[in-house]
Amino acid sequence: MEGSHFAIKDWSEDDKPREKLMLKGKEALSDAELMAILIGSGSRNESAVALSQRILASAKNLNSLWKMSVSQLIKFKGIGEAKAVSIVAALELGRRQRAEDILKLKKITSSKDAFTIMQPIIGELPHEEFWVLFLNNSNKVISKAQLSKGGIAGTIVDVRLVFKLGLENGATGLILCHNHPSGELNPSQADKQITKKIKTAGEILDVKILDHLIITETKYYSFVDEGIF
C-alpha cells in the first residue's frame, strides 16, 4: 500500500478500517484506524487514517486526546466541527463505560478503592467538581452523584443536597470527593471547612462521613489517612 496519499475507498479491502473491523474484529485495528472510522473521510491529499495518525501523534496518547475539546480538534486541517464532535463523544462514552465497570466491582475497604472509582470520573478534568459516593452498611457503593461543578479555582457545595441525596439513596455512609485541576493535593482552608460542616450535619442525621478525597490525575489526598478526621 502506498501510504497516505490515497483515499480509503481506493485501498485494498483488507486495508479499509470498516471492512477490516468486520472481517477481523475491533481488536485488529490500530488506534488510528478506529479513529478513521469516526472521522469517515480525509481529504484529497490525506487519508482518514493518516489524519488520525497525525492527531494521535500530536496528542501523544489517548488520555491526552480525551482531554482535547472540539475547539482544539478543529484546529487540525481536515477536522471540522462534526468530525470533532464525533471524536469527543466516542471518547466520552469510553470514559463512562470504564467508570461504570469500576463502580460495579467495588466494596470500599480503603481510600485507594474510592480513588480507583473516582479518578476516571474527575481526576483529569480541567475544572473542579464535587462528588459523593453513597454507601450501605456493608460499605458497598449504592450510587454516586455530582453535587457541583465549578471553575479552575473551586466549586460551591450545598450541604442540604448532600444529605437529601443520601437519605433518598438509603445511605448510611458517604465519601466526599473533589478534584484539584492544579494538581495540588493539600486541602485548602475552604476544603477543611466544608468537610467539617458536612461531618457535623452527618452526626445529627446519623449518616457517617467516612472520608473526603482530593483527587488529581495520578494521586489523591485522604482526610482519614492524613488524620484530619
From Swiss-Prot:
Motif mapping: JAMM motif: 178-191
Record GO biological process: proteolysis
Keywords from the UniProt entry: Hydrolase, Metal-binding, Metalloprotease, Protease, Zinc
Domain MPN: 107-229
Binding site for Zn(2+): H178, H180, D191
Cited InterPro entries: MPN (IPR037518), RadC_JAB (IPR025657), RuvA_2-like (IPR010994), UPF0758 (IPR001405), UPF0758_CS (IPR020891), UPF0758_N (IPR046778)
PROSITE patterns: MPN (PS50249), UPF0758 (PS01302)
Keyword ATP-binding included in the entry's annotation: no
Gene Ontology molecular functions: metal ion binding; metallopeptidase activity
Family (UniProt): Belongs to the UPF0758 family.
Protein name: UPF0758 protein Fjoh_0413
Organism expressing this protein natively: Flavobacterium johnsoniae (strain ATCC 17061 / DSM 2064 / JCM 8514 / BCRC 14874 / CCUG 350202 / NBRC 14942 / NCIMB 11054 / UW101)
